[in-house]
């Protein structure tokens, strides 16, 4: 750490103070202000190592030695509400609609997966077991919010109003497809629903989402009376291993972007 030289400013000339016991002298001090340099501090405190405890033992750390982050749940596997004080602020009609959307996605996945195996379409990916992730998260967003999906978010499209005809037109690449059949199956997109078209390369949607969120922030600054909007992006744990993931997080954090990152950890990655 660099040192700096602090000097007292004399009120009289240095010659007149030559024999004085409080004569001018150079004092060398440390320009340190972090908690780690303060007396009796047990932790390091600077960006990148917040609350990192000091230790005199050098050893390898294993992730298995730490407790995993807790998983929040509302109901158990039997459908029983875990927290009796929890009351959803949704009408019965809204809840039934969410269930129908999840059921639609599940049935469509079964039919279209078989169709792909029969050679009727060239490609398909299911979202079995992940229907609630996409449908539930999409239901709390506003229609004006911007979304970037990966390839298992059929539920997002269905919940926001993507029709059965639009699904089939995209999968079979006919003239009614918004992309005019120029894209692979399951690469849905809808300008009407504010959902960007899905792209094949893994994790490319993440920095794009951060950029879109930054644009929303700038629009809000230019027009403070406009409605606040957020940008949401979905990805899997495999995409979290890509460099684009870290770049996207860095952009969103340093720019203070209104971005929401939803990671699906299903234990599989391409």
Show the residue positions of the predicted features:
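N-terminal mitochondrial targeting presequence
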Residues: 1-45
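Thiamine diphosphate
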Residues: 4-5, 260-270
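N-terminal amphipathic, basic-rich helices that act as targeting or association modules
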Residues: 32-151
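Structural beta-strand/beta-sheet cores of well-ordered domains, especially the beta-sheet scaffolds
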Residues: 70, 145, 184, 257-259, ...
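A short alpha-helix capping/helix-coil boundary motif
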Residues: 90-91, 226-229, 261-265
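A short, structure-level motif marking secondary-structure boundaries and short turns
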Residues: 97, 232-234, 267-270
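Cofactor-binding active-site loop characterized by glycine-rich and histidine/acidic residues
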Residues: 107-110, 114-255
């Amino acid at each position: 750490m660099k040192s700096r030289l602090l000097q007292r400013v004399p009120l009289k000339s240095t010659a007149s103070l030559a024999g004085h016991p409080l004569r001018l002298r150079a004092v060398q001090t440390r320009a340190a202000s972090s908690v780690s340099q303060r007396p009796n501090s047990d932790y390091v405190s600077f960006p990148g190592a917040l609350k990192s405890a000091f230790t005199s033992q050098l050893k390898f750390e294993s992730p298995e030695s730490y407790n995993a982050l807790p998983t929040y749940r509302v109901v158990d596997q039997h459908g029983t509400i875990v927290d009796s004080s929890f009351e959803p602020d949704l009408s019965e009609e809204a809840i039934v609609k969410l269930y129908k959307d999840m059921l639609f996605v599940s049935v469509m996945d079964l039919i279209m997966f078989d169709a792909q195996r029969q050679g009727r379409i060239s490609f398909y990916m299911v979202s079995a077991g992940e229907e609630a992730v996409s449908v539930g998260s999409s239901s709390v967003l506003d229609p004006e919010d911007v979304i970037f999906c990966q390839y298992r978010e059929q539920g997002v499209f269905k919940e926001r109003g993507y029709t059965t005809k639009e699904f089939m037109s995209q999968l079979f690449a006919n003239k009614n497809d918004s992309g005019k059949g120029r894209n692979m199956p399951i690469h849905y997109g809808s300008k009407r629903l504010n959902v960007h078209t899905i792209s094949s390369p893994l994790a490319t949607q993440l920095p794009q989402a951060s950029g879109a969120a930054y644009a929303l922030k700038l629009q809000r600054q230019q027009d403070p009376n406009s409605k606040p909007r957020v940008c949401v992006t979905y990805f899997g744990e495999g995409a979290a291993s890509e460099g684009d993931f870290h770049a996207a997080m860095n952009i969103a954090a340093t720019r203070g972007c209104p971005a929401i990152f939803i990671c699906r950890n299903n234990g599989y990655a391409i």
